[in-house]
Amino acid sequence: NDIMADADEMIRSYGFVLPPWAYWTPSEFKSRAEKAKAVIDARCGWDITDYGAGRYDEMGLFLFTLRNGRLDDLQRGGGMCYAEKLLISKQDQLSPMHTHVIKAEDIINRGGATMVIELYGSDPDGNFDETAGGVVMCDGIRRVHHAEPGLRRGWRKCGRRERDARRGDD
């Protein structure tokens, strides 16, 4: 509850307003189950995870899911094609690597803290390949990322000169 209260305070401090159902009690959800079916089915709401490691302060994440895209909608190009989640990490808190086969996702750093995202490509069969690069759109700019041994593969906030210098980009 402390993590949720702290997160709610932080979210509000940025002028973001959560939907009314964010504050419903379990009994309110039960009484409104039919009305809130889309919210419930999409597994929206509060989530605090330590990824099963039992070390939240080292490896954990707070999430509030506002919308959760459906794979079949994304594949057909209509309906709820994207997810919208508020993510809060503590200083130096890690999130384990994961992959999406198909995902429409924007990562927006609203708080302005330094954020490092490591990106890796796939082999021709779609499997993880730490030697493969890829393409990502960053603030509307197409960026090619290369997997280069010995270099940190990740960006610190798009547009940083240090990243560009490290990668040899203009």
Language-model regions: role of each:
Residues 68-70, 90-93, 111, 164:
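Short, flexible loop/turn elements at secondary-structure junctions
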Residues 90, 146-170:
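Conserved metal-binding segment of the jelly-roll/cupin
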Residues 90-91, 103-125, 130, 138-140:
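Glycine- and acidic-residue-biased ligand/ion/polar-headgroup-sensing regions
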Residues 132-148:
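Surface-exposed acidic, glycine/proline-enriched linker/cap segments
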